[in-house]
Amino acid sequence: MRRDERDAKAMRSLQPPDGAGSPPESLRNGYVKSCVSPLRQDPPRGFFFHLCRFCNVELRPPPASPQQPRRCSPFCRARLSLGALAAFVLALLLGAEPESWAAGAAWLRTLLSVCSHSLSPLFSIACAFFFLTCFLTRTKRGPGPGRSCGSWWLLALPACCYLGDFLVWQWWSWPWGDGDAGSAAPHTPPEAAAGRLLLVLSCVGLLLTLAHPLRLRHCVLVLLLASFVWWVSFTSLGSLPSALRPLLSGLVGGAGCLLALGLDHFFQIREAPLHPRLSSAAEEKVPVIRPRRRSSCVSLGETAASYYGSCKIFRRPSLPCISREQMILWDWDLKQWYKPHYQNSGGGNGVDLSVLNEARNMVSDLLTDPSLPPQVISSLRSISSLMGAFSGSCRPKINPLTPFPGFYPCSEIEDPAEKGDRKLNKGLNRNSLPTPQLRRSSGTSGLLPVEQSSRWDRNNGKRPHQEFGISSQGCYLNGPFNSNLLTIPKQRSSSVSLTHHVGLRRAGVLSSLSPVNSSNHGPVSTGSLTNRSPIEFPDTADFLNKPSVILQRSLGNAPNTPDFYQQLRNSDSNLCNSCGHQMLKYVSTSESDGTDCCSGKSGEEENIFSKESFKLMETQQEEETEKKDSRKLFQEGDKWLTEEAQSEQQTNIEQEVSLDLILVEEYDSLIEKMSNWNFPIFELVEKMGEKSGRILSQVMYTLFQDTGLLEIFKIPTQQFMNYFRALENGYRDIPYHNRIHATDVLHAVWYLTTRPVPGLQQIHNGCGTGNETDSDGRINHGRIAYISSKSCSNPDESYGCLSSNIPALELMALYVAAAMHDYDHPGRTNAFLVATNAPQAVLYNDRSVLENHHAASAWNLYLSRPEYNFLLHLDHVEFKRFRFLVIEAILATDLKKHFDFLAEFNAKANDVNSNGIEWSNENDRLLVCQVCIKLADINGPAKVRDLHLKWTEGIVNEFYEQGDEEANLGLPISPFMDRSSPQLAKLQESFITHIVGPLCNSYDAAGLLPGQWLEAEEDNDTESGDDEDGEELDTEDEEMENNLNPKPPRRKSRRRIFCQLMHHLTENHKIWKEIVEEEEKCKADGNKLQVENSSLPQADEIQVIEEADEEE
């Protein structure tokens, strides 16, 4: 059957049988009746068409009449007439005598001379009246063509301008020259010309008042143009006789007005559609039959109850393009749709109907706006109809079935009888509407991003359901809210946080689909789906809270999983039935409605708990006892560890015990060295010798001891050292981006957040007991834990500290991000990876390639082994927030976004119209932490000269290695990476001026840099310091501020602040600037000496080339 025959048959099927009129059949045949605008016939094209197009005139197409024979167009007749006239004139010329030719030629020359001086002014006058008439006609014309009957008074306007002048010249004594052709208008006395011009303006004004009153601005425009055209005729038509000048001017002016009025009467002038002609648009519509528009997902009106057991078999829409792994997982889901925990899923209960109706009312209000174009109105009507159909299929209903036992986040404990009367959470009003795209959540307020189900959820009420006992009652695996996608409003970033996604996790998905493979752990076997119950699929909670769960385990050796988890639930009812977390007792009563140990404010999942299990949970009193019991329970039930893993774990314990002793012995000496901004890290590496590979883990352990983070979050030393030992082993042995650089950045963020800051106001002076935040992102002071450094305290009340304004969880995330931020760095820039199509660049779409790779690789390492889980005592909300902060801090180190962060920070902290940093706002605190790690990442120029040159040597060597590889690959060598042509001093000075300097100045202007007060003498005229060194530092600081971007002035004070960081930055910048000036002087003198011949040592010539050059 051909395609046209199939289409015709389908279109015929749209007509219902006589007397039947079956609407369901007409709805499911794939076609729908509609109306469209017909195609408009193009007007005839030619010279006249282009003239009208230039004059903004739209030609109406001739009516289509196929029955009438084609006639000759008016343009054809005009061309024939002109041709006949030209032939007649040519015949007369050929028939005349030669003498008459000479007389005619002389007369023709005279005529051409007169016309050459007169045609241009006359044409200008005609055009002026033409465009004036078009303008006034457009402003006074009603809708539609041919409505400008009140504009014919404009024909009298040229007469008022010139005929009155003509009568004055004839009857009164004002001379207008001597009357012959050679007389020129300038011979007229000025007072006579001014009087005639005044008379012309009076006539025009009288015409405007009597004939057709206009607006004031239009009247002024007409008077100005009348005076202009009269002056043109008065000064430019001197070659014509005096009597012909006003007559011809009035005649051509009237012709221009007449032409404009004719065009407006017979044609339509285009103008902006201020009010769409809805009625005419509706009349031009023609009925058509078109294919029904379908989306790539199941229709919202096609509920699961009508999929089976009904005579309606809905048409299956086309599937999107998916990968092979996704297709396998989706196919498995389709086979499991009849499971009890799938019942009532996708019913739309998570949609707030009040919000949906509110949106529909807003669309209806938009439809009443007459200024909308027809296509927008049509789209809004379609949206309104879709929302109407969706609201009819999203009525909330109570699920009478017992939920299937799951392994997923706990929900609040509630009475099933109260479900029907309970209102939806206000936080879900605008964020719970389904959408085909995954949204991201920062996890800042406990909301969990729910994984969108990729299957078609169906519900067949005919299938018998399995009965479950009380002990198997747990959380919904895919409850009625599984289609909700929750978002956090007003978030600065869109990083995906690690969370318990509601939906089944398949075996091996975490490892086999992981984009980054760490070099420190082997591949994880994917296993098989055979003989696995849905509750066996691993979730993130397994790796975080059950150290015995290992992905490398064999499925054949696994115990009876349902029985095992049944034993767990029966033995300790205070454990979460889904993830094994404990229901912590410090959660307040106000939070019990919307938060829990795993999901926090994760929405209104209608989970049913029995009264017996609820009573058992209330009997637990001590949190420590519960955690010990849960760990013992997991250890007793764990039979998946192999002998090799057990022996390796024992070896790690012995190594860490000995390492702990070493760290305890060296803690005092190490923390003393770290208390200095110029941390002698290279001396420490040389002193450690063979143990220098442990510098990152030792410094990390020392900092956590100093700040008390180990005690606050109950971090186990064994897992802590296991992970950071593995993390530092993942850093490559390259000149700059190695474990020493990570340690230096870690020290810098610790120093910036724990050292005293002059003039900083502290908002907290004690420690809380919890780590929750309010729904609007503001902290609750009675529940937030803060840290303080044991090695340093504020000298007096005039000093403050960042650690007293930033919660402990956020500072711990900042420290961990500093240790992770260059993990597995290849020693190449982002630009190089993109240019060579490296796998990382392809994976991350050429955007922040290295930063995404560092974060993903470090977290992949953390999740690879249970003995790396040093955060096991964080609850789910805290871990989610922690992971989000770490990722955001690592991504902030991409210098391609440097100026975006700098502008945002200046607008928040240093703008005169800003309220400054609000420490109770989590977004402001996140911005401060991001700028802090950015400053720590490029702190080399702010160190003492020796350390600065050491770091410079490392980055230059690494960049030269990249330049060598680019040369070997035949690629153009990146700027400043060619060993043969170094431009070190110039680039270093530019890097400090444009990158490091503005960032440090902004951070200092915000009052966040550590320092100390310098007392100054009080004097009425001047302020001079007691110390000459302080004066010298002030002078250098002022010079630095002149060279770099000036920082906004803060409050005036008689005391000055000495900042060691800014002092070193000023010194280094001054030295590099002197080297640049010396080089320029040498070039001016023709000397080709290089920087190596200068008075500075060889190391002084090495330049810091930071990652800012990666994008050049």
From Swiss-Prot:
GO BP annotations listed: angiogenesis; cAMP-mediated signaling; cellular response to insulin stimulus; G protein-coupled receptor signaling pathway; negative regulation of adenylate cyclase-activating G protein-coupled receptor signaling pathway; negative regulation of angiogenesis; negative regulation of cell adhesion; negative regulation of cell adhesion mediated by integrin
Mutagenesis or variant effect for residue 6 to A: Loss of interaction with RAPGEF3
Segments for region (Interaction with RAPGEF3): 1-25
This protein's UniProt keywords: Angiogenesis, cAMP, cGMP, Hydrolase, Magnesium, Membrane, Metal-binding, Phosphoprotein, Transmembrane, Transmembrane helix
Cofactor notes: Binds 2 divalent metal cations per subunit.
Active-site positions on this chain: 737
Protein name (record): cGMP-inhibited 3',5'-cyclic phosphodiesterase 3B
Function comment: Cyclic nucleotide phosphodiesterase with a dual-specificity for the second messengers cAMP and cGMP, which are key regulators of many important physiological process. Regulates angiogenesis by inhibiting the cAMP-dependent guanine nucleotide exchange factor RAPGEF3 and downstream phosphatidylinositol 3-kinase gamma-mediated signaling. Controls cardiac contractility by reducing cAMP concentration in cardiocytes.
Membrane-spanning parts: 88-108, 117-137, 152-172, 192-212, 220-240, 247-267
Protein's UniProt keywords contain Cell cycle: no
Family listed: Belongs to the cyclic nucleotide phosphodiesterase family. PDE3 subfamily.
GO molecular function: 3',5'-cyclic-AMP phosphodiesterase activity; 3',5'-cyclic-GMP phosphodiesterase activity; 3',5'-cyclic-nucleotide phosphodiesterase activity; metal ion binding; protein kinase B binding
EC number: 3.1.4.17
Natural source organism: Homo sapiens (Human)
Any one Pfam family match given in the protein's UniProt record, by short name: PDEase_I
Compositional bias ranges of the Basic and acidic residues kind: 1-10, 454-466
An example Gene Ontology CC term for this record: guanyl-nucleotide exchange factor complex
